[in-house]
């Protein structure tokens, strides 16, 4: 299966089509000799294609200056050990499975013991699929930026008057009505999913319910029973390699690179989806937590970076455990409640991954469907969904107390999902002008909140990425800051009784430590959600003249940005933000296994990494520049005010008293970051306003640090050190 990443279209009636290959570099990935030829058919040797990286590159180059100074390297391809594992011919596809062996005789990074037996030899098994392209009456549908589908990009090189000459085709299945004249009809051939016999029996009903729930959306597009589900018999005479079977598969890996993944195979000429499989990881529904790294994963450097893959279920395990911890601590945690958490999460995961295989991309705006008051009311959320699209990455929805426990996850396609399926799958009208008008009427609804859309290119998961705080991962409700504050208050209320609830006679403190970690990860995630409103810009992709449209860019109102800084000051930067008991700290012990690493909890590192994750955002060059830029079109929360508020949050509360060790870390970290801005070296390039205001705030810090009367020796030493590093930096 060879995908054409970019395609250029030339109208054959246009003389320019005669020069369609001019200034276009075509890649020659491999070559092979013709062994035999008969009646126009060729026999070639394929080893140069399939036993090398010609068709699929596995090794990656080393990036100089990267954060990881000693990255894991798989080595060079060992051609003498690389081999074919299997060759399977099916009626509509041929699969070649190749085991690539890489050799690194002297590795400096031995990797992880999770699935890697010896770093000197790494095996990668890759399946190459050759798929027969169909010949049918499938009609492509072209993308619109207001609704999110995966696409095959096509640029019209002969369109003279169109500023956006795009003919990008959305990816969709070929569905036909049995009775085309009826508004709603049974389908000729449904999209049939097979639940593989590897699926644990106790999970099959939830998976089935999640798949079949999509029929609700297809009915709005005119199709009845468009999606079907079957169970693979144990004695089935077919396997998942046959493209005629769309299979939901399960695995239980030691350290999976994904937890739920829904790839599909597409005809690059039309956008028709030819087949799909979904791989789900059982580890997402277990209590296995990587506690050896729980105190290292709060900064934005460790946020999910691969926007092209689906990592939804990676976080679902943590979300499920948080829901169980919270329910056990603030409500009546019964076996029925535990079942509901697992059931709803698995239905939601199935909906999400099936959505990808239907062609839908992520929609990280979708969590804004309900108000903060309604989000915990099952009677409101169950009929239409907890969020407007199951294609979002959300956290488990946990209420503030046992009386306000709504849905944990969504169990039905939301309003956006139904609208998107209606756009992509409703059969075209015979008259092109009528069809264009029909689509415009449907797309004109995009200004409504329930149809809001923002994908991976728009989201703010990483520091400095994106601009619209509504397009964020793991947030909830149309008041994300209010929900994040509520989440942090819930976590704070759980901590005092956490040890007594999670210690069991005869057991180690491993589960308690895991619970402590998960609560803090959720706490840090809430802080990052809040931080995105500072310097944020609300974005609207409505078309000119569309009813209900707003300006394309609207700065987040001043009062919202100020409130975000207030919340961060209280919940993240203040002296009592992490006021845990000594008893809790002294019991953070994981169960011994082997002898690697020190076992004492690195508490200061945990807290500082959480604070770093927010400072990464607030002091990112993109954010500081954007605050200055948005002052030109409506932002009244100036860069000067923001940086002054940040300095105040880090220094003012203990200006005349002793400074705790956690605040010493924070103040030193913040000071060093301002120094870095002033020096303005390396890859990050700050504008002059950011440099000047950083310089000004360093002088303010010197004034804070000059107060050394009536404080202990540690505080005196800390403040003298701040003055020293500031003077040294400004003198160079």
Label each region the model flagged.
Residues 1-199, 208, 216-217, 221, ...:
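Auxiliary tRNA-acceptor-end handling modules of aminoacyl-tRNA synthetases
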Residues 170, 245, 258, 263, ...:
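Generic secondary-structure boundary/loop-capping signal
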Residues 203-210, 342, 346, 350, ...:
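Stable alpha-helical elements in mature extracytoplasmic
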Residues 212-223, 253, 355-356, 360, ...:
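Sec-exported extracytoplasmic/periplasmic mature domains
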Residues 227:
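Conserved structured catalytic cores and adjacent interaction surfaces
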Residues 231-252, 257, 344-400:
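The catalytic-center signature of Zn2+-dependent metalloproteases
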Residues 272-291, 305, 350, 355, ...:
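Extended catalytic-interface subdomain
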Residues 337, 341, 367-732:
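Conserved catalytic/binding loops enriched for acidic/polar residues
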């Amino acid at each position: 299966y060879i995908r054409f990443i970019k395609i250029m279209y030339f109208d054959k009636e246009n003389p320019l089509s005669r020069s369609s290959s001019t200034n276009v570099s075509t890649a020659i990935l491999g070559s092979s000799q013709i062994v035999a030829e008969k009646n126009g058919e060729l026999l070639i040797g394929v080893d140069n294609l399939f036993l090398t990286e010609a068709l699929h590159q596995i090794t990656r180059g080393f990036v100089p200056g990267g954060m990881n100074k000693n990255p894991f390297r798989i080595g060079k391809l060992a051609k003498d050990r690389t081999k074919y594992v299997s060759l399977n011919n099916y009626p509509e596809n041929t699969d070649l499975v190749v085991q690539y062996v890489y050799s690194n005789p002297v590795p400096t990074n031995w990797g992880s013991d999770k699935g890697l037996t010896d770093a000197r030899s790494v095996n990668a098994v890759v399946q190459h699929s050759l798929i027969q392209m169909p010949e049918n009456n499938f009609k492509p549908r072209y993308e619109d930026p207001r609704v999110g589908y995966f696409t095959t990009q096509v640029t019209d090189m002969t369109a003279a008057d169109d500023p956006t000459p795009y003919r990008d085709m959305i990816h969709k299945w070929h569905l036909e009505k049995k009775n085309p004249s009826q508004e709603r009809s049974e389908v000729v051939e449904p999209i049939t999913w097979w639940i593989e016999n590897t699926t644990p029996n106790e999970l099959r009903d939830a998976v089935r319910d999640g798949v079949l729930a999509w029929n609700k959306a297809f009915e709005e597009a005119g199709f009845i029973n468009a999606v079907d589900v079957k169970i693979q018999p144990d004695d089935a005479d077919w396997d998942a390699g046959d493209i005629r079977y769309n299979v939901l598969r399960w695995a239980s890996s030691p350290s999976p690179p994904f937890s739920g993944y829904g790839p599909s195979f597409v005809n690059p000429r039309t956008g028709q989806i030819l087949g799909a499989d979904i791989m789900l990881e059982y580890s997402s529904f277990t209590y296995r937590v990587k506690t050896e790294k729980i105190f290292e994963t709060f900064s934005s450097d460790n946020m999910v970076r691969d926007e092209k893959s689906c990592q939804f279920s990676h976080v679902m395990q943590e979300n499920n455990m948080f829901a169980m911890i919270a329910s056990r601590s603030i409500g009546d945690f019964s076996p029925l409640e535990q079942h509901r958490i697992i059931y709803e999460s698995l239905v939601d995961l199935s909906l999400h991954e099936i959505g990808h295989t239907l062609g839908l991309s992520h929609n990280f705006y979708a969590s804004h469907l309900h108000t903060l008051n309604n989000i915990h009311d099952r009677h409101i959320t169950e009929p239409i969904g907890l969020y407007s699209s199951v294609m979002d990455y959300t956290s488990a929805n946990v209420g503030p107390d046992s009386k306000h426990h709504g849905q944990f996850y969504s169990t039905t396609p939301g309003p956006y999902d139904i609208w998107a399926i209606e756009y992509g799958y409703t059969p075209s009208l015979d008259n092109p002008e009528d069809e264009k008008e029909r689509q415009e009427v449907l797309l004109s609804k995009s200004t409504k909140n329930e149809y809001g859309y923002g994908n991976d290119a728009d989201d703010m998961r990483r520091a400095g990425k994106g601009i619209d705080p509504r397009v964020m991962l793991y947030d909830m409700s149309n008041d994300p800051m209010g929900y994040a504050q509520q989440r942090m208050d819930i976590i704070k209320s759980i901590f005092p009784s956490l040890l007594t609830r999670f210690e069991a006679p005869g057991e180690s403190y491993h589960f308690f430590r895991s619970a402590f970690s998960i609560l803090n990860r959720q706490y840090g995630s809430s802080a990052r959600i809040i931080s995105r409103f500072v310097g944020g810009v609300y974005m609207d992709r409505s078309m000119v003249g569309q009813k209900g449209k707003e300006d394309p860019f609207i700065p987040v109102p001043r009062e919202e940005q100020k409130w975000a800084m207030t919340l961060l000051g209280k919940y993240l930067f203040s002296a009592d933000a992490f006021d845990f008991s000594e008893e809790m700290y002294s019991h953070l012990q994981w169960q011994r296994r082997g002898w690697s690493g020190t076992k004492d909890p690195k508490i200061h590192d945990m807290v500082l990494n959480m604070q770093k994750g927010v400072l990464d955002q607030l002091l990112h060059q993109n954010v500081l520049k954007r605050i200055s830029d948005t002052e030109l079109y409506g932002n009244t929360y100036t860069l000067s005010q923001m940086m002054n508020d940040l300095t105040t949050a880090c220094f003012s509360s203990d200006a005349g008293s002793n400074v705790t060790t956690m605040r010493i870390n924070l103040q030193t970290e913040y000071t060093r970051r301002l120094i870095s801005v002033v020096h303005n070296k390396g890859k990050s390039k700050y504008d002059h306003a950011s440099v000047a205001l950083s310089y000004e705030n360093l002088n303010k810090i010197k004034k804070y640090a000059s107060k050394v009367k009536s404080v202990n020796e540690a505080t005196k030493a800390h403040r003298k050190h701040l003055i020293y590093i500031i003077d040294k930096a400004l003198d160079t």
